Amino acid sequence: MTDSVSKAVARTIRAPHGSELHCANWLIEAAYRMIQNNLDPDVAERPEDLVVYGGIGKAARNWACFEQILRSLQALQPEETLLVQSGKPVGVFRTHADAPRVLIANSNLVPHWATWDHFHELDKAGLMMYGQMTAGSWIYIGAQGIVQGTFETFVEAGRKHYNGDLTGKWILTAGLGGMGGAQPLAGVLAGACVLAVECQESRIDFRLRTRYLDHKAFSVDEALAIIDKACKEKRAISVGLLGNAAEILPELVQRAKAGGMKPDIVTDQTSAHDPINGYLPAGWDLARWESSRQSDPKAVEKAARASMAVHVQAMLDFCHMGIPTVDYGNNIRQVALDEGVKNAFDFPGFVPAYIRPLFCEGKGPFRWVALSGDPEDIYKTDAKLKALFPEHTNLHRWLDMAQERIAFQGLPARICWLGLGERHLAGLAFNEMVRNGELKAPVVIGRDHLDCGSVASPNRETEAMMDGSDAVSDWPLLNALLNTAGGATWVSLHHGGGVGMGFSQHAGVVIVADGTAEADARLSRVLWNDPATGVMRHADAGYEVARDCARRHELTLPMAKELP
C-alpha cells in the first residue's frame, strides 16, 4: 500500500471498552484492544500516521498492516501465535495455550547495517518500521508511562545534590513529546519548578490539556519571570516555552554568565535520537522542516546534528558552572561527539547517575491497564497495592499523587516502580480481583523496555557498567526468551528505541490477568523471572547490591561464587 492510500484510509481509532469480546479469549482480546489504544488520539502523537511517540515510533507498518493485524487477532485461536515483523503480520502458527499469543520483532538489523540510512531505505521500500519501545509492542499508556521514572530521577537528583529538597529549585529541559511530556509533571511532583523548551506549540497545548503542564510562554523573559516568581514563593510549577532548544539554551547560558538566573538541574528529552524526524534545526521553521524532511532529508540531518552540537555545548557550559547536568537517554551526547564536541560525555547519563541502584534490586516501571475502560478499576488496583505493600510509603505517596494529578489517556492505566518479589504479588492480586468480580474486566500488565534486565543501550540504560559490558546485548535476548518460555501473553524484541539505530537492543513483555488459575501460574512465572533477569544481569556485572538481592531471593546463579 502506498503512503497516499494508507493515509486515505486513516481513521480515528479507539480501543473497545467493556466486557464484550471481539476475539476468542481475553488474552487475544488484550492485544486487539492495546494496539488500538496505542493509536487513540488522546494517546498517540500522530495517530493519522500510525505514530505513537518518539519521532516515528509506530504501532503498525501501514494502515493495511494495521487492519490485517486486527483481522488476524479476531481469527486467532487460543492455541495459536501471531508473528509480527516490523509492524506487519506475517504468520500464524500452532503453539499451545501457555505460549504467547503474539510475538513481535521490530526494527532489528544485522549490526553492520544497523544505521539510520539503511533503515530509511527499508522503511521507504515498505520493508520495516521503527517500533521505538512501547509503540510497536502495544503497551504505550501516554506520558504517564514515563512519569514515575522521571519523578524518581528528579527525586534522586534532589537527594544527591540538594539534601533531598527541590523546593525553590528549577529544572531546565527541552522536549514535550510522548516521553519528554512527562518532565513538567514529574518535576513538579518532585517539588521543583520546570522550564521545558518545545518547538511545536501543539505539543505544549497537548500537555496543558492533559494537565502535565501548567503554563505556556512565548519568550525567555516571560518564562523566566514565571519561574522566578514561583521559586521565590516556594511553589512548584511548570512552564512550556515555545522555541528551539539549540537557540534558547545558549541564550540562557549567556544570561547566567552575566549574572542572570541559573537553573538548578539541566537535562533534555528532545527526540535527538532521530536527526531527521525528531529534532528541528536551529533557525528553521516547522514548514521548512516538514517539507525538507521529504525533499532533502540529508540537509535536515546535517543541520539538526549541527544544532545538537550547539545544544550539548550549552549543557556543558551549565555543567562547568557546577550545575548538575544529565543526559536523559536520547543519544544527544553521541551526536555532539560525532560533530566534534570532544567532551560531550563530561556529564553523565541518568541511569548511572541516579537509577542503577534501583535496577540492581530488580526495580523498574510496572504498568497495568484496565481493559474495561472504567477508571474505577484502576482506583481499586491502586488501593490493592497500598494494602499489599503497607510499608512502601513512597509507593503510597506516588499513587496518591497519580490519582490527583495524572489524567488518563485512552484506556485507564497506572504505572509504579516495583521490584523483584513485588511484581508477581501485584499480578496475582489483580488476577484475584478479576476472578472475584471486583474488577469489571481483565487487566493487562506490562512495562517499558527501559527496565533492569531487558535492554542493552551503552549510552543510556547500560552506560558505564562496572565490568565494561555496556554493549553486550545477550541480556535482552535472554530476557525475551525466558518471558516467552514463562508464558507471557506477548513478547517483543526491538532495536534502536530511545537512542536510535545501532545504539540499543531491548525486549518487552505483556501478560494478562484474566482471573483464571492458568493465569495465576503464568503471572507467577513471568512477573518473577522478568525482574530477576535484571538482578542476574547486574550481579554478573559485579554490583554488590544486585548480588545481595540475588542471595535474599535465592536466585540460582551458577557462576555467582566465581564472580570477581
From Swiss-Prot:
Gene3D superfamilies reported for this sequence: Urocanase like domains (3.40.50.10730), Urocanase superfamily (3.40.1770.10)
GO BP annotation list: L-histidine catabolic process to glutamate and formamide; L-histidine catabolic process to glutamate and formate
Involved pathway(s): Amino-acid degradation; L-histidine degradation into L-glutamate; N-formimidoyl-L-glutamate from L-histidine: step 2/3
Active site (catalytic residues): 416
Keyword entries, A-Z: Histidine metabolism, Lyase, NAD
Source species, domain of life: Eukaryota
Co-factor(s): NAD(+)
Cofactor details (free text): Binds 1 NAD(+) per subunit.
Residues given in the record as NAD(+) binding sites: 54-55, 132, 178-180, 198, 203, 244-245, 269-273, 279-280, 328, 498
EC number: 4.2.1.49
Catalytic activity: 4-imidazolone-5-propanoate = trans-urocanate + H2O
InterPro entries: Urocanase, Urocanase-like, Urocanase_C, Urocanase_central_sf, Urocanase_CS, Urocanase_N, Urocanase_Rossmann-like, Urocanase_sf
Molecular function, one GO term: urocanate hydratase activity
PANTHER family named among the record's database cross-references: UROCANATE HYDRATASE
HAMAP family associated with the record: HutU
Subunit structure: Homodimer.
UniProt family annotation: Belongs to the urocanase family.
NCBIfam families: hutU, PRK05414.1
UniProt protein name: Urocanate hydratase
Organism: Trifolium repens
